[in-house]
Amino acid sequence: MGLVDVPPPHIPSWVVPTSFALLAAGALCWDVTYVLLAFRSRRTHSYGMPLLALALNISWEIIFAIGIAEQPLERIGFLAWLLLDIPVLQATIRAAPREFAHAPLVARNIVPMVAVGCAGNAAFAYWFFAVPGRGSGDKAGKWWRGAEGYDCTELAFWTAGIAQLTVSAGCLAMLFERAHSGGTSYAIWFTRSLGTLLGWIGPSALLWCFWPEAHGFFVNPVAVFLMATCLTCDMIYPMVLAQVRLTEVVLPDGSIVAGGDHAKATLAKMH
C-alpha cells in the first residue's frame, strides 16, 4: 500500500519504493505459507490455520481487493492471496468432521464468520476514509483515489494487525490445545513469521524512521502491543512445536494425533 504516496522533499526518494518492496516480500512469504498449509493439511488430514484467523484473513483480502487497493500490482497481490486461501479453506472443511467433532457449530459457520469479518473491515475502512486527515499525524502526501489526506498504509496496518494477532496467538493456542503438529510445520511457521515481519512491521517501521510526521501510529501503544504480542507468540511457537512433536503419534493414514490415551482411542476406532 502507499505506492502513490508523495513524501515531502526531505524524505529520500528510495523510502516509499523500498517500503513497497518489503510489503511485496512479505506477501510472497504468505503466498508460500498458503501453499505449504494446503500441502501439509492434505498430507496430515488436518488444518493449520485457526478458523477465526482464516475467516479474518479472507475477509480482509476481499475488502482490500475490492474496495481499497488501487494499483494493478496491489489488486493482483490481494487476489493471489484469495486464490491461495481456497485450498486452505477446503482443507479446513475436510478436516472439520474429525477436528471439530466436539464443536460442530464452529465447523458449520465459517461462511458467517467471513461475512462478519467483511462487515467489520468494511465498516472500519468506511469510518477511516470518511474524512481526509484521519489517523496519526500529518497526512499531506497521502493519496487515495485522487484525493489527498487518505492514508492506506495506516488503514492496512491496523486492520492487518488484528488479523496478524489472531494468526500468531491463534496458531500458538491451537498447538497447545491440540498437542499435535497436524496441518503445520517448521517451514510454515518460518514463512508465516517472516511474512509478518517483512510485510506488516517492516514497511511501517521504515516509513516511521524516515517520515515520522505521517507514521506516528507505528509507536502508538496499541500498535506496540499488537506487534510485541505477535512477535512473542511467533518466537515461542517453534519451541512449543518441538515439544509437541516429541509426544504426538503419526497414524497409518498419515494423520497426526496427540500422544497418550487419545492416540490409543483413535487407533482403536480405525481398527
Per-segment meaning from a language model:
Residues M1-H271:
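Alpha-helical membrane-protein topology signature
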